[in-house]
Amino acid sequence: MPKRILQGTVTSDKNEQTVTVLVERRFKHPLLKKTVRLSKKYRAHDPENQFKVGDIVRIEECAPISKTKRWKVVTDAVVA
């Protein structure tokens, strides 16, 4: 099974080697036909502490690193 890759915005970088990434998901509600925005926060591993609040990054699923971290930061996302 391939690893999932998500794109989001760093909302916190206060912890050592960890960033919190807010990932927003948009979809059309099947009954109401209205666009719905859902967001979720993921804690991701950032070994060099190089990402700061406001950066747009890509995170990739990985083996558990700690109790709450199951994602690692891959790169800066290219903003198109």
UniProtKB/Swiss-Prot annotation:
InterPro entries according to UniProt: NA-bd_OB-fold, Ribosomal_uS17, Ribosomal_uS17_bact/chlr
Role: One of the primary rRNA binding proteins, it binds specifically to the 5'-end of 16S ribosomal RNA.
GO molecular function: rRNA binding; structural constituent of ribosome
HAMAP family found in the cross-reference section: Ribosomal_uS17_B (MF_01345_B)
Gene3D superfamilies tied to this protein: Nucleic acid-binding proteins (2.40.50.140)
Family recorded in the similarity comment: Belongs to the universal ribosomal protein uS17 family.
Protein's organism: Cereibacter sphaeroides (strain ATCC 17023 / DSM 158 / JCM 6121 / CCUG 31486 / LMG 2827 / NBRC 12203 / NCIMB 8253 / ATH 2.4.1.)
Assembly information from the UniProt record: Part of the 30S ribosomal subunit.
Keyword Ribosomal protein included in the entry's annotation: yes
The protein's name: Small ribosomal subunit protein uS17
Biological processes, Gene Ontology terms: translation
Gene it is expressed from: rpsQ
